[in-house]
Structures are given as structure tokens and as C-alpha cells.
Amino acid sequence: MTMKKLVVLISGLLAAITTFAQTPQLRTEIFDLIDFDHPGLENVKALHQNGQDAEAASALLDYYRGRKGIVTATIRDLSKVKISPEEKKWADEGLEHTFFVHYGYQPSYNYGEDINWKFWPVKDMELRWQLHRHKWWVPMGQAYKVTKDEKYAVEWTKQYIDWIIKNPYDDPDKENLRFSWRPLEVSDRLRKQPDMFMLFVDSPAFTPEFLTEFLVNYHKHAEHILANYSEHGNHLLFQAQRMIGAGCFFPEFKRAKTWSDSGVGILNREINLQVFEDG
């Protein structure tokens, strides 16, 4: 075998491994996290109790695709979703792994065909932190809704799974952990991911398996904030606000009320500490 053929073979194998790694898996632990007595989940409950978890995940996806009356602060009506030229640029560059992270560093950096979430082209803490806010993902969802082009949904699901795999909560790389799981970034993802959910949930790329990956990951984010609230200041207020949103957008979780109640309690306490008599 010539060196050229060997390089082609190795490249093909690496591409296949990456594709497999980005394939969502059925996360059966989701059935321990949701409240089967929530209205509308009767079929999900029956299928799970019958040992049909794949079918239960499909039923759960059907439930979410048909769910009414729950929206986000930024997306009230999916039929009115728009995208600016700047947002479209972020979405299109995101397809090529050129990620808009920070206005202070333009043009945006490319993070490689096999995304390197640890890439730190300029040693500015904000550049590394804000990478994990995924600012180009909501624009990808807007682009999907406006253009109906599945390439945005397909790429978003791949990047979402890739991030989960490469940035685990129990990451032994402690330096990476302090960027990827800093509470402010975690709360920012809590805020934005319901928008992504609304924008992408009807896509064929949003499979039942992906749904379970998404929900388990989202649950982990909320629990992380609950255990790691900032001590004071604006970070704490952001986190509390976003925990309220998490519980309200996903009331199907057993812990949803705990999340929302924690946020309400903090805001009620902090308004007396952070706002003086003169306003």
C-alpha cells in the first residue's frame, strides 16, 4: 500500500469514527427524570412500563412536537421568526465550524473539521468562556426556520452531540472544565437552548434519540446551577432568572418546580439586598 493510499484510508476511518461519535444514542435515564403523571405523557408512561423505551422516546417526541402554550421570551410565534444578515452570516459560517464567539475578535476563528473546543487562539479568558455560549446555534435555528434547509438542523445536532462528548461534566481536564462548565456559561445555555428546541424540534434530524440526549443534558445543566449558584451579584441574578425559565419551559421534569422555586427565592431575596430605598 502506498503512502498516499494509507493517508486516504486513515482519513476515511477518522471521518467514520467522528460520524459515529456524533450519532445520538437513546438515553434511557431520561425516563427517571420526567414526571409520567404530567398531562399528555400517558402513552410515554405506558410504553416505558412495557419495556418499549425506543417507542416511548418516539412518543415523547410526538408529545413535544404537539405541545401548545409554552414559548420563550424571545420566540412567541414560530411563524414570525426572522433572521438578520449578520445572524445569517453566523449561521452559515457555523456550518463550516467558523464560530462567532466575540465581537472583539473578528473575523471569527475556525475551530477545525473535527471541532476543537479547547482551541484558544488569543489568550483572552472571555474568548474561551464565550465559545461555550454557542452564539451561532440560535441563528442556525433561525436560518432553518426561514429557509427550511435541513443542513442547518443536521449540523446543529452534530455539533450539539460533539460538544456533549468533548465537554463532559466530569471532565478530567480541569482547565477545560472551568471554561465549559462555569456557572455563567451554563446558565446562558439554559436560557438559549429552549429557543433552539422550538426552532429545531420539527426537523427530521431531531430524532427521538437526539431528544433524549438533549433533555438529559439540559437536566444536567439545571442541576449544576442548583448546586453551584454564584454567591452574589449580577451572575447570581442571571442564573436565578434562567432557572425559573428552565422550570417553566420543561415542566415535564420532576425537578422543574424545584428549579423555578429556587430562582424565585433568590430574586425575592436579592431585590432587598441589591436595590436600595431610592431605587
Regions found by a protein language model. Give the residues of each.
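Bacterial Sec-dependent N-terminal signal peptides
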Residues: M1-T23
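Basic side chains
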Residues: K4-K5, R27, R76, R133-K135, ...
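Extreme N-terminal leader/anchor segments
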Residues: Q22-H102
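Short alpha-helical hairpin
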Residues: F99-W117, L131
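Aromatic-lined, polymer-binding surfaces characteristic
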Residues: Y109-Y111, K123-G279
